[in-house]
Amino acid sequence: MSSYFVNPLYSKYKAAAAAAAAAAAAAAGEAINPTYYDCHFAPEVSGRHAAALQLYGNSAAGFPHAHPHPHPHPSPPPGCGGGGGPGPGQDYFHAGAGSPTAAYQAAPPPPHPPPPPPPPPCGGIACHGEPAKFYGYDNLQRQPIFTTQQEAELVQYPDCKSSSGNIGEDPDHLNQSSSPSQMFPWMRPQAAPGRRRGRQTYSRFQTLELEKEFLFNPYLTRKRRIEVSHTLALTERQVKIWFQNRRMKWKKENNKDKFPASRPEAKDGDPKKEVSGLEEDGAEGCPTN
């Protein structure tokens, strides 16, 4: 501590300072003179400084105060106001002086302040026991809805999945499907009620073979249906349905109940046909008069 700061504060203790300086010199047995540096202060100033330090030490002993550092610095030995470094070993500043014990007896150091209390385990906030007991509810194990903050942002804003930095890298970022939580019932594809199959398409070869079979016989037997289905790589049901549709189409086009293959054919021994044939031949061969 500099003497320029101490002397104005303790200027009224001049008599006490002189007495304290004399007592300190008598106790030390010899004058305290530094060997390797000089404080360049007058004797009166040095005496005042020593007295001020002694009074400061006594006042500190009477009124202890908390020091910001855990280890307080002891006061320097009296007789030098030049500002030597504080520390327990002050004798290395005064190698030619007498015993440093006498100097410390003249100016006793302030007592060690009590250690500061340990910080609370809750980071400076007083804890009131367990949270379940303090808040009055059981400590439930809650699982986070989203693992990261990015996923939460994607769910809140599904259309902005890509950040502004990589929009150019992914031009189709707006066409990406939204999250399942944003799927509404009207967005889902509506399935057709019932068990309805699609329209069966036939190749040209299959259609040609079925037409030939229809002209030969519009009604297929079970045996012939199996053969046609194996030949055309179709099922029996598909062949059956095709023949049903073809018969309905023919009836609609011709307005007749009979099919070409089921027309009545004249038998070989039919007398009516023979008689009619003879009449026609006679009419042609016998000219009328």
Swiss-Prot record:
GO terms for cellular component: nucleus. Residues 252-276 have a biased composition (Basic and acidic residues). PANTHER family: HOMEOBOX DOMAIN-CONTAINING PROTEIN, HOMEOBOX PROTEIN HOX-D8. Disulfide bonds: none annotated. The gene is Hoxd8. InterPro entries: Antp_homeobox_TF, HD, HD_metazoa, Homeobox_Antennapedia_CS, Homeobox_CS, Homeodomain-like_sf. It is found in: Nucleus. Its main location: nucleus. A motif (Antp-type hexapeptide) lies at residues 183-188. Residues 62-125, 162-184, 252-289 are annotated as: Disordered. This is Homeobox protein Hox-D8. Belongs to the Antp homeobox family. Signal peptide: none annotated. It comes from Mus musculus.
